C-alpha cells in the first residue's frame, strides 16, 4: 500500500503491469471488470461505464488470451492488425483492450455507418475510434447523414497523426466480417502501408474459435481465443512502392493466419 509520501504510479506503467499480469489471461470476472481503475479514463465516467457495460455483457465470450503484454501501454506506438469474424467483436474486443491497457486508447478504425445504430456513437466515443467513411450506408438515403458523422480527414491520415503522437492504432485488414472458420480474406493494404509510412511495428493478432466444430460459419458470440504475436518491425527504408506494400501486407496476413489457425492466400474470395 502506498503511503502519502510515495509518488503516484505512472498510469502507463500501471496499465502495462496489468497487461503483463494477464499475459495468459482467462475470462474476466465481474470483480475484474468493475474493480479495474481505468486510470486513463479518469474524468470520463460515461466512457468507463460503456467499457464496463460491454465487458459485463459480452466479456465471457473471450475464453483465453495469450501474450497480452505485447499490446501493453508502454509498447506504444504500434499498429494492431487482427482478423474479423463477427460483428459484435468489433464492439467488445476494443473494450477488452481498453480495460487491459488501463483505459488507454488503442484507436480502432471503424465504419461510420454503424453510428446510425442507437448507442454506437457512445461506444465509439468511449473507445476514441477513428471513423472511416469508405463504406456507404444501407438503405442509400441514410448516406445524407454521412457528413454529420464523419471526419473531414481520411481515416488513415488521422491514424498516421495518432501514431506520430505516440498512440497506437487497431485495424481489421480483412475490411469486413468474414465468418469462414478456415480462410482469411485477401484483405486491404492500409495497415501495411501505414506501418511502412510511419515506421512503426505491426502487432499481428489471431482470433480463434475453438468450439466452432465443423460448422461452415462462425456464429455471433461464439467463444473465442486471442493470441498476440511478436511485433513485426518494418524495413528501415520507407519504401512505399506497390511491391513493397504488397510484400509487407502478405507478411502481416500470414502471421494473422498462423495465430488464428486459418490460411491466407493472395487470391480474392467472397466473405462467408
What are the language-model segments listed below?
Residues 65, 117, 153-156:
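Structural motif corresponding to alpha-helix initiation and N-cap regions
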Residues 2-34, 141-272:
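Non-catalytic C-terminal accessory region of glycerolipid acyltransferases
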Amino acid at each position: 500500500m502506498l503511503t502519502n509520501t510515495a509518488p503516484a504510479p505512472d498510469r502507463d506503467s500501471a496499465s502495462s503491469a496489468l497487461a503483463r499480469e494477464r499475459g495468459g489471461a482467462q475470462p474476466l470476472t465481474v470483480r475484474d471488470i468493475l474493480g479495474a481503475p481505468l486510470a486513463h479514463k479518469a474524468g470520463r465516467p460515461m466512457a468507463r461505464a460503456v467499457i464496463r457495460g460491454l465487458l459485463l455483457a459480452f466479456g465471457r465470450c473471450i475464453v483465453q488470451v495469450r501474450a497480452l503484454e505485447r499490446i501493453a501501454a508502454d509498447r506504444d506506438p504500434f499498429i494492431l492488425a487482427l482478423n474479423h469474424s463477427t460483428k459484435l467483436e468489433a464492439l467488445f474486443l476494443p473494450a477488452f483492450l481498453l480495460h487491459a491497457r488501463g483505459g488507454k486508447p488503442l484507436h480502432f478504425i471503424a465504419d461510420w455507418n454503424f453510428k446510425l445504430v442507437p448507442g454506437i456513437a457512445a461506444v465509439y466515443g468511449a473507445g476514441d475510434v477513428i471513423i472511416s467513411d469508405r463504406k456507404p450506408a444501407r438503405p442509400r438515403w441514410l448516406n445524407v447523414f454521412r457528413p454529420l458523422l464523419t471526419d473531414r480527414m481520411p481515416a488513415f491520415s488521422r491514424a498516421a497523426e495518432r501514431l506520430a503522437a505516440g498512440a497506437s492504432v487497431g485495424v481489421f485488414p480483412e475490411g469486413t466480417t468474414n465468418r469462414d472458420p478456415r480462410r482469411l480474406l485477401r484483405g486491404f493494404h492500409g495497415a501495411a502501408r501505414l506501418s511502412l509510412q510511419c515506421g512503426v511495428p505491426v502487432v499481428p493478432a489471431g482470433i480463434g474459435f475453438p468450439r466452432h466444430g465443423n460448422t461452415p460459419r462462425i456464429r455471433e458470440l461464439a467463444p473465442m481465443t486471442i493470441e498476440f504475436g511478436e511485433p513485426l518491425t518494418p524495413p528501415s527504408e520507407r519504401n512505399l512502392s506497390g511491391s513493397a506494400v504488397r510484400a509487407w501486407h502478405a507478411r502481416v496476413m500470414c502471421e494473422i493466419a498462423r495465430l488464428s489457425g486459418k490460411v491466407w492466400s493472395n487470391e480474392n474470395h467472397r466473405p462467408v
